[in-house]
C-alpha cells in the first residue's frame, strides 16, 4: 500500500484521539487529495468501513473551515476588500469561531477596524458571541478606547452587559483603566451600573479604589448604588478612604452613602481614616454623621486606632465629637491603655484628663 495513503488511513482512524491528531490528519488529507486524487483516497478509507457520504461531508467541512479561517484572517488584518468578497460569496459563516473563540467581528474589534466591522454588521452576525476569555466585540472596542466602534455596535443592538471571564463588563474595564469618555458613552447608552465582577467589585468601587474621581462622579450622578459591598465587604466609601482620597469620600458622603457599613474585618470608613491618619477624612465622616464607637472584630474603635498610632490631633477630634473613651477591646484595654503600651504619654494624659473631667 502507498505509504502516504497508509499514513493517512491511520491518521483519520485516530482523529478522535486529540485535536493535535486532527490537525495532522487534516494536513495529510490535503496532501493526499492534491497528489493522488479523491477517488483513490476514498477507496483507501473504505477499507476502514467509512461511509463515502460521511467522508465527503468531512472533506467539505475541511474546505469550509479553510474558507472561514481565511475570512477570519482577512477581518483580523483589516482587509476590507477581501472581507467583502468572501461575504458576497455566501460561502463563509459570519459567526465562525476559531479555536480561541474569536469571530471575524471580535477580531476586527480587537484591532479597531471599523470599516470591516461595518461590513460584517450588514451580514447580520451575532454581535454578542464571546471568545475564550469572555470578550465580546463591545468589550474589545472598550479595551482599545474606540467610542466610534462602540457606537456602531450599540446602535445595532449589541448587549452592553456581557461579562468576560473575570466578570468585567465593557463599563467596568473602561472605569478600571480610566477611560472617562468611554464610561460616559456606555452610561448614556444604558449599561447596568451595578454589575459585580468575580470579586464582587462594581464600577463605582473600582473608580473609588483607583482614584478616578471624575468617573466616580459620573457614576454617582447616573444613579449607581453607593452601598454595594464586594466580597471582602468593601464599599466605594471604604475604598476611597483606604487610599486617602478626600475628593471621592466627599462625593460619596454628600450623595448619601452609608457611613457605617463594615467590611469583613469589622472596619468602617472612620476606623480606616483614623488608623491611617487621614484627619481631613475623619472630619468629613464625623460631620457627615458617622457613628464614632463602632468596634472592629477585635473590639477596637476609631479612637483606639488613633490613640495607638500616636495621632493626638485625631484623638482630640474624636473626643470633641463625643467618642467614648471608656470602651474596652476584647483584651479589656481602653484607648489610654493602648497609647501607654506604645509610649504616647501626651495621648495618655489627654485621655486621663478627659476621664477625670467627665467623672467630676
From Swiss-Prot:
ANK repeats lie at residues 100-129, 133-162, 166-195, 199-228, 232-261, 265-294, 298-327. PROSITE patterns: ANK_REP_REGION (PS50297), ANK_REPEAT (PS50088). Coiled coil: none annotated. SUPFAM superfamilies: Ankyrin repeat (SSF48403). SMART domains: ANK (SM00248). GO terms for molecular function: RNA binding; RNA nuclease activity. It holds the Pfam family Ank. One of its GO terms (biological process) is RNA processing. Keywords: ANK repeat, Repeat. This is Putative ankyrin repeat protein MM_0045. It comes from Methanosarcina mazei (strain ATCC BAA-159 / DSM 3647 / Goe1 / Go1 / JCM 11833 / OCM 88).
Amino acid at each position: 500500500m502507498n505509504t502516504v495513503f497508509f499514513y493517512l488511513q491511520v491518521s483519520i482512524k485516530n482523529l478522535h484521539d486529540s485535536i493535535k491528531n486532527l490537525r495532522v490528519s487534516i494536513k495529510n488529507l490535503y496532501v493526499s487529495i492534491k497528489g493522488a486524487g479523491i477517488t483513490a483516497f476514498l477507496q483507501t478509507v473504505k477499507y476502514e468501513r467509512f461511509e463515502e457520504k460521511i467522508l465527503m461531508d468531512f472533506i467539505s467541512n475541511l474546505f469550509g473551515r479553510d474558507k472561514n479561517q481565511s475570512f477570519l484572517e482577512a477581518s483580523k488584518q483589516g482587509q476590507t476588500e477581501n472581507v467583502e468578497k468572501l461575504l458576497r460569496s455566501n460561502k463563509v459563516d459570519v459567526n465562525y469561531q476559531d479555536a480561541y473563540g474569536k469571530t471575524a467581528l471580535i477580531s476586527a474589534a480587537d484591532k479597531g477596524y471599523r470599516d470591516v466591522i461595518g461590513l460584517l454588521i450588514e451580514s447580520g452576525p451575532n454581535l454578542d458571541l464571546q471568545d475564550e476569555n469572555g470578550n465580546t466585540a463591545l468589550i474589545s472596542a472598550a479595551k482599545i478606547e474606540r467610542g466610534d466602534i462602540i457606537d456602531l455596535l450599540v446602535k445595532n443592538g449589541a448587549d452592553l452587559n456581557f461579562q468576560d471571564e473575570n466578570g468585567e463588563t465593557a463599563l467596568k474595564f473602561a472605569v478600571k483603566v480610566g477611560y472617562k469618555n468611554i464610561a460616559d458613552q456606555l452610561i448614556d447608552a444604558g449599561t447596568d451600573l451595578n454589575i459585580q465582577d468575580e470579586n464582587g467589585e462594581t464600577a463605582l468601587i473600582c473608580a473609588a479604589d483607583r482614584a478616578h474621581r471624575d468617573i466616580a462622579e459620573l457614576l454617582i450622578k447616573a444613579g449607581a448604588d453607593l452601598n454595594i459591598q464586594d466580597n471582602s465587604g468593601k464599599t466605594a466609601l471604604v475604598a476611597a478612604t483606604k487610599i486617602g482620597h478626600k475628593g471621592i469620600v466627599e462625593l460619596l458622603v454628600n450623595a448619601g452613602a452609608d457611613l457605617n457599613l463594615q467590611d469583613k474585618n469589622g472596619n468602617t470608613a472612620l476606623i480606616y481614616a483614623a488608623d491611617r491618619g487621614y484627619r481631613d477624612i475623619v472630619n468629613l465622616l464625623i460631620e457627615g454623621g458617622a457613628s464614632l464607637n463602632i468596634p472592629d472584630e477585635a473590639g477596637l474603635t476609631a479612637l483606639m486606632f488613633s490613640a495607638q498610632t500616636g495621632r493626638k490631633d485625631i484623638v482630640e477630634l474624636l473626643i470633641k465629637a463625643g467618642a467614648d473613651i471608656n470602651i474596652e477591646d476584647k483584651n479589656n484595654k481602653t484607648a489610654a491603655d493602648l497609647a501607654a503600651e506604645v509610649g504616647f504619654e501626651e495621648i495618655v494624659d489627654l485621655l486621663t484628663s478627659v476621664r477625670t473631667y467627665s467623672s467630676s
